[in-house]
Amino acid sequence: MSNAASERTAADTLRALAETIEQRRGASADTSYVARLHDKGLDAILKKVGEEATEAVIAAKGGEREQVVYETADLWFHTLVMLSASGVSVDEVLAELERRVGRSGLDEKAARGE
């Protein structure tokens, strides 16, 4: 791992990846997977997120650590594409996660009326 990469936080990595996704969004669908996904529209992106979520669940059920990491990375990547298509920034999601740190999940659900 390079020194720059080792100094990057997880949030920095997500932001950098989201920025790359935004840059590639307007590229040619012939040369960019991200552009191809965006050209297919939100429903196709959501289908892909669902597929990747299923693969992550299957990997976790199988118990192979490397597969769990690989499939979760795919899921997170496609979730970032979904956020891009939905006009939601990584920072909005990170802020929501930060808000939840230290808060009981049961309290969170109760506050939402679930």
From Swiss-Prot:
Q: What is its EC number?
A: 3.6.1.31
Q: Name one GO biological process term.
A: L-histidine biosynthetic process
Keywords attached to this entry? Amino-acid biosynthesis, ATP-binding, Cytoplasm, Histidine biosynthesis, Hydrolase, Nucleotide-binding
Q: Supply the Pfam families for this chain.
A: PRA-PH
Q: Name one GO molecular function term.
A: phosphoribosyl-ATP diphosphatase activity
Q: Does the keyword field hold Ribosomal protein?
A: no
Gene3D superfamilies given in the database record: MazG-like
Which compartments does it reside in? Cytoplasm
InterPro entries cross-referenced by the UniProt entry: HisE (IPR008179), PRib-ATP_PPHydrolase-like (IPR021130)
PANTHER family, alphabetized: HISTIDINE BIOSYNTHESIS BIFUNCTIONAL PROTEIN, HISTIDINE BIOSYNTHESIS BIFUNCTIONAL PROTEIN HISIE
This chain belongs to the protein called: Phosphoribosyl-ATP pyrophosphatase
Tell me what organism the protein belongs to: Halorhodospira halophila (strain DSM 244 / SL1)
